[in-house]
Amino acid sequence: MRTKLLELVEKDQIRTDLPEIREGYNVKVHVRIKEGNKERIQVFEGLVIASYGTGINKSITVRKDSYGVGVERIFKLNSPLIAHIEVTRINKVRRAKLYYMRDLKGKSARLKEIKKAK
């Protein structure tokens, strides 16, 4: 249950520079990595298989295959560590959670593209 006071406070804190992100989108998440006193940007590109939360607590799970090994990472969308997010492809899906993609490999892991992202 969300109170009106909580929504009022969150409205000022929430990021508005991010695009709409849903399950089935292929995204590039640009993450700030701090190593010692240096900071760099690392890109994590993959498929959004789940999203949870609302408002300031919204987060997404992004999955990619790296050298034959599946890698999943959870991102809080309002984190200051996220520089920006690009939507690279919009796929047609009929589920809210795409956990079945974990078991699929090769051609069976393809999704039908709806349209190119801008």
UniProtKB/Swiss-Prot annotation:
GO terms for cellular component: cytosolic large ribosomal subunit. GO terms for molecular function: structural constituent of ribosome. InterPro entries: Ribosomal_bL19, Ribosomal_bL19_CS, Ribosomal_bL19_sf, Translation_prot_SH3-like_sf. It comes from the Bacteria. Keywords: Ribonucleoprotein, Ribosomal protein. Pfam families: Ribosomal_L19. Coiled coil: none annotated. The keyword Ribonucleoprotein applies. GO terms for biological process: translation. This protein is located at the 30S-50S ribosomal subunit interface and may play a role in the structure and function of the aminoacyl-tRNA binding site. Belongs to the bacterial ribosomal protein bL19 family. This is Large ribosomal subunit protein bL19. It comes from Metamycoplasma arthritidis (strain 158L3-1) (Mycoplasma arthritidis).
